[in-house]
A protein has these predicted regions:
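Accessory cap/linker subdomain of secreted extracellular hydrolases
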Residues: 82-170
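Short amphipathic alpha-helix adjacent to the substrate-entry channel of hydrolases
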Residues: 5-24
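Catalytic nucleophile-loop/oxyanion-hole region of alpha/beta-hydrolase
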Residues: 24-57
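Short beta-strand/loop motif that positions the catalytic acidic residue
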Residues: 173, 179-181, 185
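Short glycine-enriched nucleophile-adjacent loop
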Residues: 65-76, 81
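Acidic catalytic loop of the alpha/beta-hydrolase fold
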Residues: 184-188, 219-222
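C-terminal catalytic histidine-bearing segment of alpha/beta-hydrolase fold enzymes
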Residues: 195, 206-276
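Short alpha-helix in the alpha/beta-hydrolase fold that links the catalytic acid
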Residues: 175, 189-203, 227-228
């Protein structure tokens, strides 16, 4: 949802750095991603240019971190890409809501994203409805996390090794690429995915300048500390502790990671903003 509280809070943090921000969403109150048309990004870029924005950057976290990478790999006008806890491949589309007692389910034959009317090649999930949600629910209870889908992703990749066409072509990204994640991410193995992207870039010609950082402890919420405080002025650290078990065990390390992310991301954005 473009009016989502977390999205609006992220916008406030970014605006303080002197950049204009436009939020993107599949639809109002829609937290699923299935065949999301990348033409929406194209239209947004055109609108921003029409209104005097000469530079285009894109940022996302979690699934939208993967969206940011995918869009930047296709649209060469994007000169800054920030991906927090992303995957390096496109996966099967999913919906959220209520269905047969499940809060989320994959959609057969649909990708996370589409372009020119066609779904992008994607990794199918090992578990389909209703087993998909059962696995997530069981793992969340077992690990003490708000959401734990790492087993879902690990088992899916084991059953269906990711093909070249399913990997995001990060070597096509222009300008600055900033990747951030944590080893203890409960949703998916973003640390592995980030290292895989670094390896891909080392092996392929590319023009982007990449900065990748992976923290031992940071959870799925690898947000800049100031951004999280904007979202939750009181109790931001407590909220992360309640959401993810790693934050309960390593609160100081998670806090230190968020402060470092804030410093790094602020520098990256300001350098890009000021570059002639």
């Amino acid at each position: 949802d473009p009016e989502d509280y977390m999205a609006r809070s992220a916008v406030k943090w970014l605006i303080r750095l002197g950049v204009n921000v436009l939020t993107m969403s599949p639809g109002k109150k829609d937290y699923g991603h299935h065949n999301y048309p990348l033409e929406c990004i194209e239209k947004a870029m055109a609108w921003l240019k029409l209104h005097g924005n000469e530079k285009i950057g894109i940022a996302g976290a979690s699934t939208t971190g993967t969206l940011a990478l995918t869009a930047a790999s296709i649209f060469s006008d994007i000169s800054l890409t920030i991906a927090m806890t992303p995957s390096d491949f496109v996966w099967q589309g999913f919906m959220q809501g209520k269905k047969d007692g499940c809060k989320e389910w994959p959609i057969e034959g649909e990708s996370l994203f589409s372009y020119k009317g066609k779904p992008l090649p994607y990794m199918p999930f090992r578990y389909q409805h209703p087993d998909y949600w059962r696995i997530i629910s069981e793992e969340s209870k077992r690990t003490g996390n708000m959401v734990a889908s790492r087993k879902l992703f690990d088992d899916s990749e084991a059953a269906h090794p990711i093909t070249e066409e399913e990997f995001i072509k990060v070597e096509n990204i222009r300008g600055k690429l900033f990747l951030v994640g944590a080893e203890d991410d409960a949703l998916w193995d973003t640390a592995k995915y980030i290292r895989r992207m670094e390896k891909r870039l080392a092996e392929k010609p590319h023009s982007c300048e990449v900065e990748a950082v992976v923290y031992e402890h940071g959870t799925h919420f690898v947000f800049p500390d100031g951004m999280l405080k904007t979202m939750l002025p009181v109790g931001s650290a407590l909220f992360v502790k309640l959401a993810f078990s790693a934050a309960k065990k390593y609160p100081r390390e998670c806090k230190t990671a968020r402060i470092d992310i804030d410093r790094r991301m602020t520098r990256v954005i300001c350098d890009w903003r000021d570059k002639k």
